[in-house]
Structures are given as structure tokens and as C-alpha cells.
């Protein structure tokens, strides 16, 4: 089973990935957790290139770098793991490309869909959890309210995070559009809930999907 987590930076995806991995492992399932971009030596190098705050990268180059990282990760890690019967939990997948490079950067959505299909080997998630958070709340999680006006001048932000508030508002709107198009796959959860409340909603959705918890398939 391929489970993906989506949301803008600061939504709490990483926390929920860890919680879900622990839950499934305790029930006898083999679980692999990965993040995008990254996961292989080459993909990690691409990640550093993409997130380095001083790098000036065009929108098309950014798209192709993210996609190259995904193609590398899919072929070398994810596809073999799925074929071996392992559950794979991903912190970001192709929905991030659609939201960030499509809605955020304004690239053609049909072009993105084809690139996403190629890079992901045509594999789609069994279920996606989208943790919904406003860009303003995301920034407040990283900065105090007093320092919020200076957030985008901070060296604490990586290149993607430094794209500005309006960019992240477009990204969030993009996620909502993706959700509207695929409500059967994507589960939206309020990221302002407590981590445990979010975890319970995730488990409830998986139970509704009839995911076995004893390691049997």
C-alpha cells in the first residue's frame, strides 16, 4: 500500500508519518517511510540543490529537478518495496508538484500531469492525507507573531519557503482543487487539531479503507 501525506510546509506531515509508521509496525506490517525530494544519494543531492536558499532556479528547472528526484526514488526504492509487499509512507508525492509548480508557479497542469505520470511510473497512492493549514498559521508555527512581518527576510527559510505568502496561498488553493477533483483518494484533515486528534482521524480513514492490521494481505 502506498500512503502519501501532503500539505504546505509546517502542516505537521512528518509527525504524522512517524505516528502512522509506529502504529502499522506494532500490528505486524512492514513499513518504509520516505520523503520527497530525497531518499537516494542522488535524490538527496537534488534536494540540497532545490532547497538551498541562495540558488536561483527557474520554474521549469525546478519542476524537472523535483521530477528527477521522484523518478530516481520510484525506480530504486518505492517500486521494489511495493512489489515486496511493504507499505510505503511518503512525505510528499506528485500532488506537491501539482500544487507547488502548477498552482504556485503557474505551470501548465496538463504538462505536469504527464510529467508526474512518467516520474511516478504511473503508480498512484492508495490514499492521501492532506493536512490543511493557512500559510499564516504555518508561519506562526515557525516564527512568533512579533517577528512574522520579517519572516521572509529570515535566513531560517529554505528556497521554497522563501517564495512568499501569496505563493503559498496559491499552493493551498491548488491543494483544495486537487481534493475537489479526487475526493475518493484524498482525505483533508484540519492541521490545527492536536497531533493525536489528527492521528485518530488518519486511523479512522484507514479502517474505512479496510486496511488489515495483522500484516496479512
Curated annotation (Swiss-Prot):
Cross-referenced CDD domains: TMPK
Keywords assigned by UniProt, alphabetized: ATP-binding, Kinase, Nucleotide biosynthesis, Nucleotide-binding, Transferase
Family, similarity comment: Belongs to the thymidylate kinase family.
Keyword match Transport: no
HAMAP family reported in the protein's UniProt record: Thymidylate_kinase (MF_00165)
Domain of life: Bacteria
Chain sites annotated for binding ATP: 7-14
Naturally occurring in which organism (per UniProt): Chlorobaculum parvum (strain DSM 263 / NCIMB 8327) (Chlorobium vibrioforme subsp. thiosulfatophilum)
Reaction catalysis annotation: dTMP + ATP = dTDP + ADP
GO cellular component, one term: cytosol
NCBIfam families: DTMP_kinase
Name assigned to this protein: Thymidylate kinase
Plastid recorded as keyword: no
Record-linked InterPro entries: P-loop_NTPase, Thymidylate_kin-like_dom, Thymidylate_kin_CS, Thymidylate_kinase
GO terms under biological process: dTDP biosynthetic process; dTTP biosynthetic process; dUDP biosynthetic process
EC number: 2.7.4.9
Purpose of the protein: Phosphorylation of dTMP to form dTDP in both de novo and salvage pathways of dTTP synthesis.
Amino acid at each position: 500500500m502506498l500512503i502519501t501525506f501532503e500539505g504546505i510546509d509546517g502542516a505537521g506531515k512528518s509527525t504524522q508519518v512517524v505516528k502512522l509508521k509506529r502504529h502499522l509496525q506494532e500490528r505486524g506490517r512492514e513499513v518504509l517511510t520516505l520523503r520527497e525530494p530525497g531518499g537516494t544519494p542522488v535524490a538527496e543531492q537534488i534536494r540540497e540543490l532545490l532547497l538551498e536558499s541562495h540558488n536561483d532556479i527557474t520554474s521549469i528547472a525546478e519542476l524537472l529537478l523535483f521530477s528527477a528526484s521522484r523518478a530516481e526514488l520510484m525506480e530504486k526504492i518505492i517500486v521494489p518495496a511495493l512489489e515486496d509487499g511493504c507499505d510505503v509512507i511518503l512525505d510528499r508525492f506528485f500532488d506537491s508538484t501539482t500544487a507547488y509548480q502548477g498552482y504556485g508557479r503557474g505551470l501548465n497542469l496538463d504538462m505536469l500531469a504527464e510529467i508526474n505520470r512518467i516520474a511516478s511510473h504511473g503508480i498512484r497512492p492508495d490514499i492521501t492525507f492532506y493536512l490543511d493549514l493557512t500559510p499564516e498559521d504555518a508561519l506562526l508555527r515557525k516564527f512568533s507573531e512579533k517577528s512574522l512581518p520579517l519572516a521572509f527576510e529570515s535566513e531560517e527559510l529554505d528556497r521554497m519557503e522563501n517564495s512568499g505568502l501569496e505563493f503559498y496561498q496559491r499552493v493551498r488553493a491548488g491543494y483544495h482543487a486537487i481534493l475537489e477533483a479526487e475526493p475518493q483518494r484524498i482525505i483533508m484533515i484540519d492541521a490545527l487539531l492536536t497531533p493525536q486528534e489528527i492521528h485518530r482521524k488518519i486511523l479512522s480513514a484507514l479502517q474505512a479503507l479496510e486496511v488489515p492490521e495483522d500484516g496479512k494481505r
